[in-house]
Amino acid sequence: MPSNSTPANEEKEEESEKIQKSPVDTPHTPNGSVSDNEENETSSTGEVTRCVCGIVESDDEASDGGLYIQCDQCSVWQHGNCVGFADESEVPEVYYCEICHPEFHKVYQRGRGAKQSKYLGNGKPIEASQTEESSSTPPSPATKKSSKQRLTMNSRDAALDYEEYLAIAKEKSLIPRRSRGRTSSKSLSPPAPQDESQGTEINLKQKIEEENDEILEDSKESKDENEENKETSTTNVAETDAPEEETVDTVEEIADEEKHSVKEESGEASPQSSQQSTITSISTTTRSTRKAKREAAAEDKADLPAAVAPKPSKTRKVGGRRGKSSSNDNHRIPQLHPDGTFVETITKPKGLHSRITMTEMRRRVASMLEYIGHIQVEMAAQSAGNQSSTKSSKEGPEEEKETLRMVDNLTRDLLHWEQRFSRT
């Protein structure tokens, strides 16, 4: 059983018992106290102090009167503070040193200080034995004197484990779980009842702030959605206006062409009636062919389904005429005539919108590939006819080779684009 007094006090008590009583052999009692013979033997051999901190003393007079605790197996004395016991109330009924039972000790060292241990053995504090011994033994002058405290502030802090310190700090709300950049470094005193009310107020404020943030985010999202809806509505309106603009363009083009044809007829008029008849016939045929082409294109667009039909192109107002570009924008594109000759025709390109869709691009690429295929077939037929008839000059084949190479490069680029952006 661990002793609650110093070795010097126990030696004095043993000497007084020797004078009053004769040595009698008594068996080992169940509460862990030794017999008088064993006490005489231990007193004759001397007490041994072997602590975790590394101090080994065999002289009893070297003790400073602090708290000591004895191992129940090897009867070695150790410093109570070095083993993790600051008061006598914390001492268990049964104690074993770190050599007899190392599993009960958790030895640690802080910096360059002495080693210390934390006793992990389970036991109840010996309050009853303390009261009995205090009532049986009179207070000695050594106990009346103030005991020398060997522990400094650093060693006292080191006696506490870091995990225990964190647990105590959390219990006393020194480390708030949710803090917005503000830390409270107050004393370790227990929190006052006002702290709970303050904590509830802080939690309420945090909840209110979070709700306000959510409301602001929702409002921003709704504004973004409204702006997107406005943009889509404006694009739809522009698309609906586009067919009207195209119809106006076609009417103006027809009027210009008629005026141009009339001027040509008036300028090229001759006294010969045969020439006038030929000119008028040519103009009528050109008009009829143009009308037929337009009607065929309109029928093709009507026959196409809604998903495949091309979307009307968007045009912008330039000057006073809607969607009408200048004459400089017209381009001359060579087309193959059935007779085998290339004829340049004036075409007006449609301006591509900056926000064209991928489906429109795919449709245009497909139409371009189809057109290039027709051109390649016609060029192959033309080259075969020329070779069979007569030998052409050197310039002709070179030009054809150049055009064929350009067509091949264009088809290669279009196929590469189609493979990259095709639907998966």
Swiss-Prot record:
Q: What is the role of this chain?
A: Could be a component of the RPD3C(L) histone deacetylase complex (HDAC).
Where are the annotated segments for Disordered? Answer: 1-49, 117-155, 170-341, 381-405
Q: What SMART domains does UniProt report for this protein, alphabetically? A: PHD (SM00249)
**SUPFAM superfamilies per UniProt:** FYVE/PHD zinc finger (SSF57903)
- Skewed-composition ranges (Acidic residues): 241-256
Mark the PHD-type zinc finger spans by residue number. Answer: 48-103
Q: Where is the composition biased (Basic and acidic residues)?
A: 257-266, 294-303, 392-405
The molecule here is called: Putative histone deacetylase complex subunit cti6
* Protein keywords: Chromatin regulator, Cytoplasm, Metal-binding, Nucleus, Phosphoprotein, Zinc, Zinc-finger
> Which Gene Ontology molecular function entries are recorded, alphabetically?
methylated histone binding; zinc ion binding
- One Pfam family, short name: PHD_5
Q: Give the gene symbol.
A: cti6
Q: Which Gene3D superfamilies match?
A: Zinc/RING finger domain, C3HC4 (zinc finger)
Q: Does the keyword Metal-binding apply?
A: yes
Q: Name one GO cellular component term.
A: cytoplasm
Q: Where is the composition biased (Low complexity)?
A: 127-137, 272-287
Q: Which domain of life is it from?
A: Eukaryota
Q: Where in the cell is it found?
A: Cytoplasm; Nucleus
Residues bearing Phosphoserine are 187
Composition-biased stretches (Basic residues) = 313-324
Report the record's Gene Ontology biological process terms: negative regulation of rDNA heterochromatin formation; transcription initiation-coupled chromatin remodeling
